[in-house]
């Protein structure tokens, strides 16, 4: 049996495990981060894939792209009924969906599909929610701190997983019939 380096694979049952040395872990986190995030030079309007922070909580915007434009300005909102954006919570976790960068450290984040938040917004004269001084301003004047933005396909994958999760059909079926139907 020979020694294995960090790129070696070991077959165990029906899956493969990577052996990763600690010295390579930060490189992998960095590669994952830069593969899934848009450039930090781009400061996007609030849209699908934007990761924001409110108080000590992180959120991922899953509002469909087509619903992130033509947002009424604050003085155009009638009956105190502003446009609303949909977010899911993301939390620091060892089982991560993506990484965010904070103070030159990469933090693994996991989407919590069961924690949905709706936030009221208003648009500017161009009908979008712009980024100003690294913050998005909500209808109630709360400020969302901009953290990063996922590339469109990564964000769409998460939005699709969210939609699949909430669109499951649950019925109250007799157990004997449910089991009989599988035979």
Predicted regions and their residues:
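Extended alpha-helical coiled-coil/bundle linker/stalk regions that scaffold oligomerization
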Residues: 2-112
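C-terminal terminal-subdomain/extension
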Residues: 92-183
């Amino acid at each position: 049996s020979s020694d294995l380096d960090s790129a070696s694979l070991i077959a165990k049952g029906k899956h493969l495990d990577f052996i990763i040395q600690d010295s390579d872990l930060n490189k992998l986190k960095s590669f994952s981060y830069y593969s899934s995030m848009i450039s930090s030079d781009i400061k996007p309007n609030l849209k699908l894939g934007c990761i924001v922070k409110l108080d000590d909580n992180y959120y991922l915007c899953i509002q469909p792209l087509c619903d992130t434009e033509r947002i009424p300005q604050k003085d155009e909102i009638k009956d105190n009924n502003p446009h609303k954006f949909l977010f899911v919570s993301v939390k620091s976790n060892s089982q991560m969906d993506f990484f965010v960068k904070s103070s030159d450290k990469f933090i693994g984040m996991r989407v919590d599909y069961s924690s949905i938040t709706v936030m009221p917004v208003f648009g500017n004269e161009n009908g979008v929610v712009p980024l100003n001084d690294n913050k998005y301003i909500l209808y109630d004047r709360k400020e969302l701190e901009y953290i990063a933005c996922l590339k469109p396909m990564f964000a769409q994958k998460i939005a699709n997983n969210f939609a699949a999760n909430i669109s499951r059909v649950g019925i109250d079926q007799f157990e004997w019939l449910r089991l009989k139907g599988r035979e």
